[in-house]
Amino acid sequence: MGAYFDELCRAMEYLSQDSRTMFIGQAVAVTGTAMTTTLKNVSDEKKLELPVAEEMQMGLSTGMALAGLIPVTFYPRWNFLLLAVNQLVNHLDKVKHMSREGFQPKVIIRTGIGSTRPLNPQCQHLGDFTEAFRLMLTNIEVIRLDETEDIFPAYKKALERTDGKCTILVEWGDYYNEK
C-alpha cells in the first residue's frame, strides 16, 4: 500500500482515540472492503458491523449523533451512499434547522470513488457524485481527498469542527495502492 493508504490508517487511528467516536457500517468489523483495512489499528470495541441496509445505517448514524456520539459511518462507494439519500438530505442535513439549532449532530461519512485497477467493477461502483452532493447539502461539507496531504487534516477537521456541520470525505479507491 502507499502513502495515501497510510494516511487513511493514521486518520482512522486518530479518530478512534476520541471517546465519542464509533465506526459503523458494512465490513467495518469483518474483512470486506479496502476501507476495512484502514481500521487495522482501531479497537474492535469501536466497530459496529451492520447489515447491508444503507438508509437504516444513515438513520442510525443520525440517532447516535443526536445522543452525543460521533459516528464514522462507512459507505465504501458513492453508489451505496445513494441508497441513503433520503436520510442524508431530508434528515441529517436538516436537523440543525428543524430543531432551531437545538441539535447539531456531528457525523463523519466515509465514501469512495471505486477503483478501476487491477479490476474494473464497471459503472455501478465508479460514480463520483461529489459535486451533486455539494449542491444538495447545506449543513454537510463534502471534501474530496485528491491528495495524500489532504487526508489527515480533513479528518481532523471533521472531528474537531465547531460550526455544527457534518462531513462527507470522498476517497479514491485507486489511490490506496498508487499514491
Identify the role of each PLM range:
Residues 1-179:
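Thiamine diphosphate
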